[in-house]
């Protein structure tokens, strides 16, 4: 029996022991900023406010245990439709999946319960699947949606020299429409996670840098949320700080937009709002910030302005991206 199954059975035995004393409670670790989780929240059947969450958690644990014993996988959507009266919404399944990850200290990919992939990719990339299928991005007329389960990718083949991640789908589509592969002299792979990336997108980027030895660059908005997205790719998600193995790219190169470039944009910048400043303070409190990233966040605080990638879209493909990559202008 594997470790996951044993941990789930341990949780079940503890719950049964508590039930003898009339206490139907599950302990779920809270988010942490490091590898040690010391705080828990109690999800109790005895409490009307958390009774539904308790039932969905039990449902999720039972399905994960079944997967570990029998093999296979479920989708978030499939789990919802298996018992819609209990679950009530797919978002409840997504929340319970993350809670189970915290309880078992693992990533969603390891559970075998999969969410639809958000990531899009274009360029020189061939994904050789374990079932024999080949997903060749160069053969598609448009972008290729990344597979839901990246662990079913047996091998990745590419002649690309690097990976370029862009924060938003709109920028991804704009670059393709401007023939970014034709105007740039070097072969590369273009990826977007459509904002905050899912585990699948982060896993693919990790594998490209580790297995294929490609450099990875990222282009995000010059605002605190863009910086946070860059940090998710680089260091992992705060909500899953307990399990980032295979999902991070520490050597990720941030080519822009840098807040220090905002003064040169002129009319392309807008004022920060209260939520932006709160996010900046949250990010500055992190202990994994590189000095250059911290300095750029301080710049945001000083100028009280932010800018989107679209503000430089007209010269992004011919000037901005090639200049940043060829001259190593990254943080």
UniProtKB/Swiss-Prot annotation:
Which keywords does the record carry? DNA-binding, Isomerase, Magnesium, Meiosis, Metal-binding, Nucleus, Topoisomerase
Kindly report, in one word, the top-level EC class recorded for this enzyme: isomerase
Q: Which gene encodes it?
A: mei-W68
**Similarity annotation:** Belongs to the TOP6A family.
**Catalyzed reactions:** ATP-dependent breakage, passage and rejoining of double-stranded DNA
* Record-given protein name: Meiotic recombination protein W68
What job does this protein perform? Required for meiotic recombination. Together with mei-P22, mediates DNA cleavage that forms the double-strand breaks (DSB) that initiate meiotic recombination.
* Main location, first listed in the record: nucleus
Its localization reads:
Nucleus
Q: InterPro entries annotated for this entry?
A: Spo11/TopoVI_A (IPR002815), Spo11/TopoVI_A_N (IPR013049), Spo11/TopoVI_A_sf (IPR036078), TopoVI_A (IPR004085), TOPRIM_Topo6A/Spo11 (IPR034136), WH-like_DNA-bd_sf (IPR036388)
GO molecular function terms here? ATP binding; DNA binding; DNA topoisomerase type II (double strand cut, ATP-hydrolyzing) activity; metal ion binding
Picking any one GO biological process from the record gives: late meiotic recombination nodule assembly
| Requisite cofactors | Mg(2+)
- What Gene3D superfamilies does its record include? 3.40.1360.10, Winged helix-like DNA-binding domain superfamily/Winged helix DNA-binding domain
């Amino acid at each position: 029996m594997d470790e996951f199954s044993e941990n789930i059975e341990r949780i079940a035995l503890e719950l049964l022991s508590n039930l003898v004393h009339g206490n139907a409670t599950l302990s779920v670790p809270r988010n942490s900023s490091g590898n040690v989780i010391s705080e828990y929240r109690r999800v109790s059947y005895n409490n009307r406010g958390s009774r539904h969450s308790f039932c969905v958690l039990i449902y999720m644990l039972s399905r994960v245990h079944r997967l570990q014993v029998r093999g296979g996988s479920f989708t978030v959507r499939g789990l919802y439709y298996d018992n819609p009266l209990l679950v009530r919404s797919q978002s409840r399944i997504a929340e319970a999946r993350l809670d189970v990850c915290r309880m078992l200290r693992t990533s969603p990919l390891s559970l075998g319960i999969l969410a639809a992939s958000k990531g899009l990719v274009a360029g020189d990339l061939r994904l050789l699947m374990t079932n024999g299928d080949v997903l060749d991005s160069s053969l598609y007329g448009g972008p290729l949606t990344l597979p839901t389960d990246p662990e079913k990718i047996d091998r990745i083949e590419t002649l690309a020299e690097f990976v370029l991640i862009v924060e938003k789908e709109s920028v991804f589509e704009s670059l393709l429409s401007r023939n970014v592969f034709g105007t740039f002299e070097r072969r590369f792979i273009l990826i977007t996670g459509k904002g905050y990336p899912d585990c699948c997108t982060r896993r693919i980027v990790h594998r490209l840098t580790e297995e294929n030895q490609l450099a990875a660059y990222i282009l995000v908005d010059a605002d605190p949320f863009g910086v946070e997205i860059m940090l998710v790719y680089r260091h992992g998600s705060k909500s899953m700080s307990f399990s980032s193995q295979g999902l991070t790219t520490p050597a990720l190169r941030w080519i822009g937009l840098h807040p220090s470039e905002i003064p040169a944009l002129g009319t392309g910048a807008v004022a920060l709002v209260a939520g932006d400043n709160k996010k900046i303070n949250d990010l500055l409190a992190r202990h994994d910030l590189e000095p250059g990233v911290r300095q750029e966040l301080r710049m945001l605080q000083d100028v009280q302005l932010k800018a989107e990638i679209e503000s430089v879209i007209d010269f992004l493909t011919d000037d901005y991206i090639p200049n940043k990559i060829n001259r190593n202008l990254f943080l």
